[in-house]
Design a protein with these regions (language model features):
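N-terminal active-site wall of soluble small-molecule enzyme domains
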Residues: 1-48, 56-59
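C-terminal helical cap(s) of enzyme catalytic domains, especially alpha/beta-barrels
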Residues: 177-210
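Glycine-rich, proline-tolerant flexible connector loops at the mouths of alpha/beta enzymes
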Residues: 1-10, 174-188
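Active-site mouth loops of central-metabolism enzymes
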Residues: 1-7, 26-30, 50-51, 108-109, ...
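Active-site glycine-rich loop that binds ribose-phosphate moieties when present
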Residues: 11, 53-58, 82-85, 114-115
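Catalytic beta/alpha-barrel core
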Residues: 24-33, 45-58, 69-80, 98-104
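Catalytic alpha/beta core domains of metabolic enzymes, predominantly
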Residues: 66-174
Length: 217
């Protein structure tokens, strides 16, 4: 019981470096303590502040001070407008860029809902891109023997809705066999379904952009 832990900072960064070398893709990882930021910035392109830590000033400033892009997840208890302070701190510290990610709002105990107005409100309040986390938004916090449960069947519909509502990007956790993933197994999208879903939402995004009045993607 309980949530799985990662391999540790050194081993984790080695694995990320291997992924970057093999794929040539930009890398993103969470950081949980200020002391981790400079080390992680040697390997990854984007430092991500977890939602529960988005008000930790020392962490946000340390991430920004690396000069990397900083993605800050909105706390599940926070209004979109409240993210402006965290964005300002990351910018002032020297971040190359900042984004804010919507990942749902507490709706009672052990449940999250997504307010699709959040993307426009985040942009208006912060002036930075608003990202949608389509997988953590279906979490059921603390519902699986001390770890998070989830409702992954809702991932595709929420992703489609977020693109229609004008989000600027997507964060999606995926795995070839989610049931075998050491963490977040109950709120991942199977890898085989990722490509078709992205094809679908890119078409949707084009439709939204063609009729956009300047709000959103």
């Amino acid at each position: 019981p309980g949530a799985a832990r990662g391999p540790g900072l050194d081993a984790g960064l080695r694995r990320l470096a291997e992924v970057g070398s093999a794929t040539g893709l930009p890398l993103l990882t969470d950081v949980h303590e200020p002391v981790q930021c400079a080390r992680a910035a040697e390997v990854v392109d984007v430092l991500q502040i977890p939602a529960f830590l988005c008000r930790q000033t020392d962490l946000v400033e340390a991430a920004g001070a690396t000069g990397r892009v900083v993605n800050i997840k909105k706390g599940q208890w926070m209004a979109p407008e409240e993210m402006a302070a965290a964005v300002d701190k990351a910018r002032a510290a020297g971040a190359a860029g900042v984004t804010v990610t919507e990942r749902g709002t507490f709706f009672g105990y052990g449940n999250l809902v997504v307010d699709m107005r959040s993307f426009a409100r985040i942009r208006a309040a912060t002036g930075v891109p608003a990202i949608f986390d389509g997988t953590h938004s279906v979490q059921r916090p603390g519902q699986a023997d001390g770890a998070s449960g989830g409702d992954p069947e809702h991932i595709p519909s929420l992703v489609r809705a977020s693109v229609a509502a004008g989000c600027d990007g997507l964060f999606i956790e995926t795995h070839p066999e989610p049931s075998r993933a050491p963490s977040d197994a109950t709120n991942m999208l199977p890898l085989a379904r990722l490509g078709p879903l992205l094809d679908e939402v890119m078409q949707l995004r084009a439709v939204v952009a063609s009729g956009s009045s300047g709000e959103g993607a």
